[in-house]
């Protein structure tokens, strides 16, 4: 289940995608649950848009697309039917006016809405209006205004707004370029203010805001670099 400000979505056990909203994004939705498509493996939401991936790697979208980030040709007003906007996509993420897609070959692309004054052809495919960010990417998290990527070699990269050191790059300065902050990572989890990495050796590392003891290090001081969080017993197997 995914919950947005004005639209919600669920993928059922049979891989069918259903949405409900209060702004008329879906066909005759009007707050009622409506089936959109079959064979869906992932869905991502913004305030007014729905983007999803099918089992065959096709990327589809519907919504208002006020800024052009999701790549449907009608970039204003209601969009009554989902439109194919890409293919060979493994993972998608939406952050405000930006849509990110990881392709099957590990390439990470970003398409930004016109609020950023990027120039692209509204009639072009999603990928032709996007820019390549990184290679060898297996996972990405985009909580609010910063970005965290896990690459296939286990390295973790961050960029964006650096409130309370949530980038983990050793400073409190914002960064508009991806920077490596830790290696040997197995899994990454992020919130709006702090981040966590589970390493291959089972150790847990965290960084960022710690006003309420979120990091679990026994203090309430933020950390601008990843720090190991020690607990009694054996290592961790996974995290959410």
Feature locations, PLM:
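Short coil/turn segments at the loop-to-beta-strand junctions that recur within blades
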Residues: 39-43, 76-77, 87-91, 136-139, ...
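A detector of tandem-repeat and repeat-rich interaction/domain scaffolds
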Residues: 155-157, 179-180, 186-190, 198, ...
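Surface loop/turn motifs at the tips and blade-to-blade linkers of beta-strand repeat domains
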Residues: 34-38, 83-86, 131-135, 179-182
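Short coil/turn segments that connect the beta-strands within blades of beta-propeller domains
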Residues: 5-6, 15, 47-48, 57, ...
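Acidic surface patches and DE-rich sequence motifs
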Residues: 12, 28, 46, 54, ...
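Short glycine/serine- and acidic-residue-enriched loop/turn motifs that recur at repeat junctions
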Residues: 18-34, 60-80, 109-131, 160-177, ...
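Conserved core positions of repeat-based scaffolds
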Residues: 7-10, 19, 49-52, 61, ...
């Amino acid at each position: 289940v995914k919950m947005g400000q004005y639209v919600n979505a669920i993928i059922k056990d049979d891989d069918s995608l259903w949405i409900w909203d209060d702004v008329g994004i879906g066909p005759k939705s009007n707050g009622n649950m409506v089936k959109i498509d079959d064979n869906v493996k992932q869905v991502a939401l913004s305030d007014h848009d729905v983007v999803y991936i099918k089992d065959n790697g096709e990327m589809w979208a519907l919504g208002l697309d006020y800024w052009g980030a999701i790549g449907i040709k009608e970039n204003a007003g209601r969009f009554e039917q989902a439109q194919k906007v890409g293919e060979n996509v493994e993972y998608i993420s939406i952050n405000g006016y930006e849509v990110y897609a990881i392709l099957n070959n590990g390439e990470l692309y970003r398409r930004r809405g016109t609020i950023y004054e990027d120039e692209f052809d509204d009639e072009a495919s999603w990928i032709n209006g996007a820019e390549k960010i990184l290679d060898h990417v297996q996972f990405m998290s985009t909580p609010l205004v910063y970005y965290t990527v896990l690459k296939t070699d286990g390295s973790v990269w961050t960029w964006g707004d650096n409130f309370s050191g949530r980038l983990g790059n050793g400073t409190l300065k914002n960064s508009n370029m991806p920077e490596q902050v830790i290696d040997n990572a197995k899994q990454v989890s992020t919130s709006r203010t702090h981040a966590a990495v589970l390493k291959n050796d089972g150790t847990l590392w965290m960084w960022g805001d710690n006003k309420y003891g979120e990091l679990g290090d026994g203090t309430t001081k933020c950390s601008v670099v990843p720090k190991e969080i020690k607990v009694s017993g054996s290592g961790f197997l996974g995290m959410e």
